[in-house]
Regions:
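Extracellular/luminal segments of secreted precursors and ectodomains of membrane proteins
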Residues: 3-156
Length: 156
């Protein structure tokens, strides 16, 4: 857990959690839309977003590297991840902020396709421009990415 006095680490964790939740929401909306033949009603989109956020706490975790917890969120089963109460809270709160009703239309727009471009656009729009969770558009785009992860891990 970040130290109580480490505001920078908390800010990065919130940004990384937002990006991971945003990626999961875009992916799940695109998959549900594809399953339904390209059409997704608002009610179905809302149910999909609620289900994604309900799973966020269980599926998202902080990656482990050399036996240490990093600031990088992942949901890949092939990646060693740390989980726990505060990690779950970061993931769930990030997802809940994105589906609070204010950003649902944007998520439905980004959720029309599941590719890196849609995810990056959604991160920038939602995690930076709309919520201010990430301090810059570049921070939102770089969140949880390998190059940024390596740089952060060296700094720890």
């Amino acid at each position: 857990m970040p130290r109580d006095d480490d505001d920078d680490a908390r800010r990065r964790l919130r940004c990384n959690a937002c990006a991971a939740a945003c990626d999961a929401l875009v992916r799940d909306l695109a998959r549900e839309r594809a399953r339904r033949g390209g059409t997704l009603t608002r009610a179905l989109a809302d149910a999909t977003m609620e289900a994604t956020c309900a799973r966020a706490g269980e599926e998202l975790g902080l990656t482990m590297r050399d036996g240490r917890v990093t600031e990088t969120f992942a949901e890949d089963d092939g990646t060693a991840r740390a989980r726990g109460r505060w990690i779950t809270v970061y993931a769930r709160e990030a997802c809940a902020r994105l589906i609070d009703g204010e950003h649902d239309d944007a998520l439905m727009t980004f959720g029309k396709r599941d590719d890196g471009g849609a995810r990056m656009e959604a991160r920038e729009a939602l995690c930076h421009a709309r919520t201010g969770t990430c301090e810059s558009a570049s921070a939102a785009r770089a969140a949880n990415e390998l190059e940024a992860r390596d740089r952060r891990d060296r700094e720890l």
